[in-house]
Amino acid sequence: MRNIKLTIEYDGKRYSGWQRLGDDDKTIQGKIEKVLHQMTNEEIEIIGSGRTDAGTHARGQVANFKTNTEIELSEMIDFMNRYLPRDIVIKRIEEMPERFHARYNAVGKKYSYYVWNNVIPSAFERNHSFYFPQELDMDKLNAACEN
């Protein structure tokens, strides 16, 4: 059995988070598992390195799944990116040792928060940042980051 690692990027604004809940098709996990089933005709459960909440985005979410398919990795990534919604992208695919587990082998997580600090709002940044048109108190922000 093969153990496949994915590095995933997604814009989570249309989704209920990472974790599939029942037959909920509004999750990142659910969308990926549906495409994996189309590709392999296997019932596959994908394991994420962590979970994201509703509306949260990811630039490098790692996940893995086990499969018996003999499809080449290059064909897998092409298929997945063709059939996944455009706001979910497989950035990298690798075959891993049997013991690899995305959650248990994770070494860290990085969270980034973006503030659009300008008098004029941005049409492009509005879904990916917090708009704050007033002057920021950088001393208070830095102190908050230390706590």
Could you say what each language-model-derived stretch is?
Residues M1-N147:
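Structured-RNA-binding interfaces characteristic of tRNA pseudouridine synthases
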